[in-house]
Amino acid sequence: MIPRIRQSQRDLIDVSNITDANSLLIYNTDEDCYNYYSKTEQEWQSLCGKLGKADFTIEDCSRIRVNGVYQNNVALTSANYLTIPVNVTKVGSYSIQVVPNPANGYYFSTSGEFLSTGTFEITVPGSGTPVNYTPTGSDGDEIKITLNGIDLDCSNKPKIKIEDTTKRPRFAISCNSVTVHGVYKKGIATTTANKITMRLNVYDGSQGATYSVKTDMIDGLSFSGSGVLGAAGTQEIVLYAEGTPYSTSSKLFTITTNSESTTATCQALVVPVISKKKIMAAGSTTYGLTSGGENGCDAMIKNIMNYGDNENSIIKYEGFASVETSSSLSDLATWVGGTQPYDIIVITYNLTPNDAQRALLVDYVNKGGVLIYLDQNNSGTDGTRNVQLVGEIFGESIDRPVDIASTCNYVIKMNPGVDDEISNGPFGDVRNGQWGEDYNNSCGLPVVPRGAIVYAGAINASTGLASTSGAQATILRHPTKNFFWCGDSGLIHGGTSTSNTTTPFQIGSRTFNGVTYPKYPVDKQAYGNQAAANRLPVCNSTLFANVMAWAIKMAEESGINSGK
């Protein structure tokens, strides 16, 4: 008689003498299969296959997903399947069967081999035709799960609702009611807080029918919801998120339904939170990225309603709480080098890079680094170096800075012909506005580099006339590299001053759709050195808020550390 033993008992058999052990035969009760010892392989082999049966389980049955619509007297198709997460601790063959309990004319089944251990999601296709629909008040068919012939005992198993085919789902979807809720982070599993709410318009005669509404899957994330249609009229429903986002890119989902009266779809945009970036703010703290205290740029960028992981944050980002500062460029080689260089470098007053530093910055930008360069030096060696950096990033030679002086009355017209995420971005549209010079010593470029996106030339916004200085550009960026330049080191100089010729950066409280943003960028009013009646609002803070949103996005998607 062939001995029937467990695998642990089999492994205690002395097989050190492979000649004597060769061809030993046992029945492995764990695998439910015959095993024999092979002298050639010097290991136990299974007659059920070289790998034998796998050891695996479902650790959380609540994560089993039921896909598709199920109707009585309607055969299952390829759209009807289960997605089951399993944890494999031993490679080998597997079989999975899922049946309704009690039986109802359909089932799910699959088999195969696990070639490595770890966690996997298995798709288990359905077959058959449901016989009985789910009665009113019931959650659906209970299921029994069998893994390699052994019934699995687990709680929180999903139930499968079978629609009554005599009740037809006829309804329309209201796209303007679609609202995305929750915070989405790369690598973090979604919870019940992650959902989409929307309204249905239920038609007469559909009460009691089952609705099914879902999205496509993008980057590991999808939404779905189902339920029973109520009386004719408006009905709010919830689509809960499933899965874990595996990228920070924005995701535009298409919402589809099982309505028999329309094939219309809606869309829902999900914007995941971008991870924190290494940021260096170089220059005077009076004029730089962290200037202005509670009334300036520092407060604007660090407020989580502007840039944060709040559900209502304008930019979904882990925040600027850890911005580093430096009053010199002496450590620039360290900032741009190594295995983890700074993602974003912001240079303001009064730090014009020397020749060696310029070469480092050009290389940094060419490798994907984000450089925001605000420099008003317009004469002498530093003036030349200022515009040389711009030229070299564009692959051109520019060595003559232009002094704007007071030729624009401190208010320079924005370019209305440029429409992108900086000129018309998440914090507002500045295309028909003007930016304010901080004092009257801005630098302009004598030429526009090839391909440059010019946000502002040198047109006096109060008169509509071009500056007599001959400047052609005062604010621009590169079309493909992560580089932004402004010829005024005080572009983001802010605070509580009411001066009409300095501190053009201002923030205030704004409320949108019932949500308050206490440190929001706002125009500074009545700016410029012209007659009081002709002074204008300036958009410095809105412009720069959009610039920082662009910088974060570029650092994430095409930055120097992207993909690391």
Where do the protein language model's features map onto the residues?
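Short, solvent-exposed loop/linker segments at beta-strand-coil boundaries, enriched for Pro/Gly
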Residues: 100-115, 215-229, 261-263
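Short, surface-exposed loop/turn segments at beta-strand-coil junctions that are enriched for proline
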Residues: 127-135, 242-248
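Short, surface-exposed terminal/edge motifs of secreted or surface/virion proteins that either
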Residues: 25-50, 371-373
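Catalytic beta-strand/loop cores that center a nucleophilic Ser/Cys/Thr
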Residues: 405-510
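Aromatic-Pro/Gly-enriched surface loop or interdomain linker
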Residues: 272-344
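Extracellular/surface-exposed low-complexity repeats and stalk/linker segments enriched in Gly/Pro
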Residues: 1-27
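A glycine-rich, often tryptophan-bearing local segment used as a flexible ligand/cofactor-contacting loop or short
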Residues: 351-439
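Extracellular ligand-binding/catalytic regions of CAZymes and related secreted enzymes
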Residues: 481-484, 488-564
